[in-house]
Amino acid sequence: MKIVVLDSYCVRPGDLDWTGLYDLADVVEEYPRTGYELLADHLRDADFAVSNKCRIDDAVLDACPRLRWVGLTATGTDSLDLEACRRHGVAVANVPGYSTNSVAQHAFALLLEVANGTAARAASLRDGYWQSGVP
């Protein structure tokens, strides 16, 4: 079995443990980035693919008849042509619950910024002003 990781740069080193892939497959190929023009070459004899942002569509799937599964290291599936995957019998998995807490925290941080102008006040302090407009 062959697994291809198409865009490992999207995952910070240490965030994911890839050893399970190496235990599962005979061959694992890992590419930091894969442009669209290289997808068919990288996936031609792959059984499984792991991706985040690579566009996988009919043209790519036509060139990769062994591909059976695509795992996304993201919540969204917009990088895949899901209908094309269905037609080619390629299963798709994503991580729908990934970063839910972080998104909520970020939303509250932005709300507090809008309400309090924290960034403007921090910039004023860095520029040597203790109170707005007073040197």
PLM region spans:
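N-terminal glycine-/charge-rich "phosphate-binding" loop or analogous flexible N-terminal tail
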Residues: 1-48
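Phosphate/diphosphate ligand-binding glycine-rich loop within oxidoreductases
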Residues: 47-127
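A short, basic/flexible loop-to-alpha-helix module at the beginning of a structural domain
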Residues: 128-135
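Structural motif corresponding to alpha-helix initiation and N-cap regions
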Residues: 15, 33-40, 54-58, 79, ...
